Each structure stands twice: as C-alpha cells, then as structure tokens.
Curated annotation (Swiss-Prot):
The chain crosses the membrane at residues 235-255. Pfam families: PIN_2. Coiled coil: none annotated. It is found in: Membrane. Keywords: Membrane, Plasmid, Transmembrane, Transmembrane helix. It is a single-pass membrane protein. This is Uncharacterized protein MJECL38. GO terms for cellular component: membrane.
Length: 259
C-alpha cells in the first residue's frame, strides 16, 4: 500500500509541476513580435512560414512535439451516429493528416463500439425512421475508418498504472479504467471525453471536443501560442528555441538568395 501511495504522489507531482508562468512571458513577447512581422511582411509570407513550420517542426522535435490524446468510446460512437443519422462527416477524421496530433485508445474500445452499433444504433434508427440494416452497414464502415487512424493499445502489461487508474476512477466506472491507464502509461496530454465520471479525478486533463477543435484550428492557421497546457517548461522552451532557429535559417536562406 505504501508503494502504491508513493506512485500516486509521484504522478500527482509530475502532472502538476508545470511552470507555465515562466514560459508565458516569453510566449506573449513572441506573439507581439510575430504580429509586427506579419504587418510588415504580409499574409502571403506568413502563410509560407506557417506551411514551412508545420512541415518541419515534427521532423526537428520528433514525437515530443505531438499532442497525444486518449479518446473514449462515446466520442467515437457519437461521431458514427452523426454520420449515419445526419450525414455529417466525423470531425475526428480531420486529425488524420495533422502531424501534431496522435489519438490513442485501449483495445476495449473495439468491443464497446461494436456493442453500441449492435444495441444502441437500432433504437436511434427507429426514432428517426432510418433503415436499420443500411445504418449498421454505414456505421461499421465509418467506425473501421476511424479506428484505423487511432493507435489501439493493449494495456495488459500496465499493472502499476492500472492500480493508479483504479484508485482514481474505479469507484465511478470500472470500464473507464483502461482509458485512464493508457493516458497515464503513455504520458499523454489527456482524454477526449464527455463522460462526467472522468472529471472526478484531477490528475489527467479532460478535453472537450470544442477544445480539441480549437487546437486543430490554431495549428492550421499557423499560431505559435497553441496548446502547451500540459507540457513541461523545458519542452516549451525547446519548442520556442526550435522555432526561432528555424526563422533564422529561413531569413539566412533568403539573404543568401538575394546576394
């Protein structure tokens, strides 16, 4: 029990020991300077820089730079349901070509999603007078597409993390334990969910769908103040340093071409 408590304390410290204020001053100054550059050089040049950064930052920083999120079953099923009943393309598919975001889920999500398609979808179809067989076919197809772009992880070997996850959320819903276990064991930035059970714990950040969309929009627009909410200060400074170095490399390249 003592060992279990120490593990929990370590995780609490690790998740909360983020010296964001030290980085924020630098971030604010950077944005101020960046706005001046945008006014001087124009939007076309800024778009060029944005494309360049998105293409090269992942290469420079590797996997450290990616926003890693665990996604729960209800989020995926709601996407499937909207596609089948309303014809809306799942927003989660927008993540497929984004180099800065990775989605994860435990193996359990496959069975849970299948169960919801078999048992919950027919009830929804009946209310909306939608053909059940056609709806199931469409649901299975889009669910497979979504799952194929999520990293499904078998968490059977994460015993210590499972114990911590049980202590955090097991009293609310044991089915949520694999999702919390995965978020802890992979050192992710949180879980995308609408499930209120997850909010009982304070260790893992819980993301709303809208928050994730904002991050994606910020990335697409080339903003450099995006989403470093749960990243440690050293990595934050490493990111900024790499951005500055990249800018200097671009400027140097332009100067060489004009000489």
């Amino acid at each position: 029990m003592a060992n279990m408590q120490s593990l929990t304390n370590i995780e609490v410290q690790r998740f909360h020991d983020c010296e964001w204020e030290y980085f924020k001053e630098f971030d604010d100054e950077f944005n101020k300077l960046w706005n001046e550059i945008e006014k001087t050089l124009g939007r076309d040049f800024i778009n060029y820089l944005s494309a360049y950064f998105q293409k090269n930052l992942v290469y420079m920083l590797g996997k450290e730079f990616k926003l890693k999120l665990v996604v729960d079953t209800n989020i995926i099923f709601s996407q499937v349901l909207s596609y089948v009943t309303k014809g809306e393309l799942p927003w989660i598919l927008d993540f497929i070509n984004n180099p800065f975001i990775e989605l994860y889920a435990p193996q359990l999500i496959v069975d849970e999603l299948k169960n919801k398609i078999e048992n919950v979808l027919p009830k929804k179809c009946k209310k909306k007078n939608i053909d059940e067989n056609k709806a199931k076919s469409k649901a299975i197809k889009i669910a497979n597409i979504i799952l194929s772009n999520i990293k499904i992880i078998n968490d059977k070997k994460s015993n210590n993390w499972s114990k911590i996850a049980y202590n955090l959320i097991g009293h609310r819903d044991v089915k949520d334990i694999p999702f919390v276990t995965l978020a802890l064991s992979l050192d992710t930035h949180g879980i995308i969910t609408r499930d209120k059970d997850f909010k009982d714990q304070k260790i893992i950040k819980i993301w709303k769908v809208g928050e994730v969309k904002v991050v994606l929009t910020e990335l697409s627009q080339g903003s450099f103040s995006f989403c470093i909410m749960n990243v440690t200060a050293p990595l934050a400074f490493k990111i900024c340093t790499s951005i500055i170095i990249t800018i200097l490399e671009i400027v140097t390249s332009i100067i060489k071409k004009t000489n």
